[in-house]
Structure formats: structure tokens, C-alpha cells
């Protein structure tokens, strides 16, 4: 075997680079968070707590075992914010940005890895798209910070500048981390701003902007408001996203928040409709919501955002393809269709695989935590959905969990961020299927 063939055999695939890249950043972040400099008390953070926080930040989840605002120092918060930004953009995108800034030429292998990392349809134009992502991200985060600056500076003085920057990045990256907690008010999220339209609207817009995907924004910027010119995927994402905001908001409005004034009730319903799809902020007391509303939120958490975005979950396109395939079956059509375009059968198979994997992870993780911690299954399923969907919403039990249960949530967050199919492709990338096919036989379904 020649030296070239040996090198090619042991070369990492793009999917392997992605999962190892995330793991490396998480480990480095955990080590930094263990430093006494990272905490307000100047103490060393246990490794499992630092690992949990770093995983939650890189996987843009928002679940925490220590209150971010009161436990971590400004240095620790800066480490968390850096991890959120890297996780939101993607490890490969951040690495590529440094290569672009240094003037280095991006190889074809690196372009292919970048394509897989941001779910781009082709390798061509990937460098231009990466520049667009970087410029767009920092511009939108800057606008979000400036919008929230007057409110936070009014409430926190000069520290409000850091507050505005932190929450803008956290919202755009769909992370859900907040630094509003104090020793007397732990884990508040945005409950103190439930009636503040500036915070509500700004955070919601940042979440939606980060969650619809960079490719969708590229399509919008290129074709402006000419919806008919958009790619089929962009149309599906926009329609599905709008549907998943409006319908749950109407449900929440009529089922919960009776005690709020009309304006605040509308804001609360909209916010709780937007945030479960991987953002993790909340403006109301979640355990006080009805069981039906919490069930709807679990569904939204599992669905998540859109491909190539800062969000996690099984993705809006997965849901849309499965529903379109069901509609095609009822209408006795050969394939799912969107906007006069046919969906390839491989996409339907991939969507079904993703759904199966997410449901298995969600249910398996929730059952394990419920059995180990002796807690109600419904609460544990909520935390599991929040972890695997990289959301960050909690009913308050995550900080109380023992280490084995925390390790389960860490695994769910990691798998939810890198994606189950990425792990499968990374494991089988060097294997090839044979040409032989087994005999076919019918099986009864339903």
C-alpha cells in the first residue's frame, strides 16, 4: 500500500472533523471555566459542572447547573459567551474565518467540510457564503445589543452595556443563557421583562433571525421580498416557521396567562411560542403553565430551528417533509411535493431517520433521569427534550440532578447539536456498501 493511500485512508472526513471540533472546544471551555478566575467566589469549579456549562454553551442550549449571573465572574461569562458564539456559528465556520482573515487559501477539502457544517447545497461559493455569515452575524448582534442597551443601562448602569451584548449574542445564537440572576434571585431568565416590549420584540426577532438559517437569509438578501424567486427550501422554512409561531401563540394565549393585561398577554404568548424552538429564554414561570401548554412546548423543542442555522432540534424541514409525505400518501401520489417541486425519496428517508433518532434520545434520556432521580416522568421528559433540542428551558430540576443524570443531559446536548446523522456519517464514512442486494419481500404496515 503506497504512502498516499495510507494517508488517504486515515484522513478524517468532514463529519469527523465537525464532531471532534465541537468536542475539542467543549473540553477547552471546561478547563477555562474550572479556573478560580472564572467564578465570583474565586473557587475551582468541579469538572462535571464546568463540562456541563461548556457543553451547554457550545451546543447553544442554555441548561445550567449554576446561575450564570451570580456564580460566574465577568471573565467566566466572557468564556461562556465566546463558547456560545463559536457554537452558534459552528466550529468549522469560526476556523475558516481565521483562515480568511490571515489571507490563507481555503483548500477543496476545507471547503467541503464547510459545506457540510453549514448545510450548503454546493461547494461553489462557500467562501463568499462564509463571509456573508460572519458579517451578517456580527451586524445583527450589534443591532440587537443597541436596541436593548437603553433598557439594561437604565436598570444596571454601565454594566448594562455588557448585559445588552451578552443577551444579544445569546439570543441570536439561540443559546438562552442569561446573566440577570443574583444571589437572591437565581435563574430568572427574562421573567422581569414580561411586559417590556423592547426586550420581548428584540429577543424574539434575534431568535427568529438566527433560527431560520444562513442560507435562507442569503436567499432573502439576493431576491429581496420576491417570494416566488426563493429556493424551495427557503419557502418551506419560512412558511413552516411562521406556522410554528402563530398556531402555538394562539394556543398559549387562550390557555394561559389570564392574569396578565392584554398587551402583556399577547407578548407572553408570542414569546413562549418562539423560544421553545431552541432559544431557551422565558418571560413567565414555566412550572405554572398548564400541562397541555408544556406538552406543546416539548413538541416545539423537538422540532427546533432550520438547517444551517444557530438552532438545534430535528429541524423545521424534517417536520415539513414528513407532513408532505403523509399528505402525498393520502392523495396517492408517488412523492412529497412543495411549491410545484418534487421531494426526493432519500430526503423522506433521512427525515424519518432523524425523527426516529430524536424520539429515541428524548424518551430514553427522560426515562433514565426519571428512574435514577425518582422524579415525575413528565418533568424529566421536558428536560430531555430541552437538552436534545438544544433549547435550555427547564422546569427547575436540572440544577438538582446528580452527576449521572447530568452526564445524560450532556450527551443529549452534544448529540442534539452535532446531529445524529453527522455521527452516523462520521462512523461509516470509510465504509462502502456492496453492489449485492438482498431478496425483497412485502411487509404489512398499519
Give the role of each language-model region.
Residues 1-446:
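Membrane-proximal intracellular helices of multi-pass ion channels
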Amino acid at each position: 500500500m503506497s504512502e498516499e493511500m495510507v494517508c488517504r485512508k486515515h484522513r478524517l472526513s468532514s463529519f469527523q472533523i465537525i464532531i471532534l471540533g465541537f468536542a475539542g472546544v467543549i473540553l477547552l471551555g471546561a478547563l477555562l471555566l474550572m479556573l478560580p478566575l472564572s467564578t465570583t467566589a474565586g473557587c475551582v469549579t468541579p469538572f462535571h459542572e464546568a463540562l456541563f456549562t461548556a457543553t451547554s454553551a457550545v451546543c447553544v442550549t442554555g441548561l445550567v447547573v449554576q446561575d450564570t449571573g451570580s456564580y460566574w465572574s465577568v471573565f467566566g461569562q466572557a468564556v461562556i459567551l465566546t463558547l456560545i458564539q463559536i457554537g452558534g456559528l459552528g466550529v468549522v465556520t469560526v476556523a475558516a474565518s481565521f483562515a480568511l482573515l490571515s489571507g490563507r487559501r481555503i483548500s477543496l477539502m476545507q471547503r467541503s467540510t464547510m459545506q457540510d457544517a453549514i448545510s450548503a447545497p454546493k461547494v461553489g461559493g462557500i467562501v463568499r457564503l462564509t463571509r456573508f455569515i460572519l458579517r451578517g452575524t456580527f451586524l445583527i448582534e450589534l443591532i440587537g445589543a443597541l436596541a436593548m442597551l437603553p433598557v439594561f443601562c437604565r436598570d444596571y448602569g454601565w454594566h448594562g452595556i455588557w448585559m445588552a451584548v451578552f443577551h444579544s449574542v445569546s439570543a441570536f445564537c439561540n443559546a438562552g443563557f442569561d446573566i440577570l440572576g443574583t444571589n437572591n434571585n437565581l435563574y430568572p431568565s427574562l421573567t422581569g421583562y414580561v411586559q417590556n416590549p423592547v426586550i420581548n420584540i428584540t429577543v424574539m426577532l434575534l431568535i427568529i433571525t438566527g433560527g431560520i438559517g444562513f442560507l435562507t437569509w442569503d436567499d432573502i438578501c439576493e431576491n429581496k421580498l420576491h417570494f416566488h424567486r426563493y429556493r424551495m427550501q427557503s419557502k418551506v422554512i419560512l412558511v413552516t416557521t411562521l406556522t410554528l409561531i402563530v398556531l402555538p401563540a394562539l394556543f398559549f394565549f387562550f390557555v394561559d396567562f389570564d392574569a396578565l393585561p392584554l398587551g402583556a398577554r399577547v407578548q407572553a404568548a408570542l414569546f413562549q411560542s418562539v423560544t421553545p424552538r431552541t432559544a431557551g429564554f422565558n418571560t413567565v414561570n414555566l412550572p405554572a403553565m398548564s400541562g397541555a401548554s408544556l406538552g406543546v412546548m416539548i413538541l416545539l423543542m423537538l422540532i427546533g430551528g432550520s438547517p444551517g442555522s444557530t438552532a438545534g432540534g430535528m429541524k423545521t424541514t424534517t417536520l415539513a417533509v414528513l407532513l408532505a409525505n403523509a399528505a402525498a400518501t393520502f392523495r396517492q401520489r408517488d412523492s412529497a411535493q412543495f411549491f410545484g417541486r418534487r421531494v426526493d425519496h432519500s430526503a423522506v428517508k433521512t427525515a424519518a431517520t432523524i425523527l426516529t433518532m430524536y424520539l429515541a434520545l428524548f424518551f430514553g434520556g427522560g426515562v433514565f433521569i426519571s428512574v435514577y432521580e425518582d422524579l415525575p416522568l413528565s418533568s424529566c421528559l421536558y428536560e430531555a427534550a430541552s437538552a436534545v433540542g438544544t433549547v435550555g428551558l427547564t422546569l427547575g430540576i436540572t440544577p438538582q440532578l446528580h452527576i449521572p443524570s447530568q452526564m445524560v443531559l450532556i450527551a443529549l446536548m452534544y448529540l442534539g447539536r452535532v446531529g445524529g446523522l453527522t455521527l452516523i456519517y462520521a462512523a461509516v464514512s470509510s465504509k462502502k456498501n456492496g453492489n449485492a442486494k438482498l431478496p425483497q419481500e412485502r411487509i404489512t404496515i398499519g
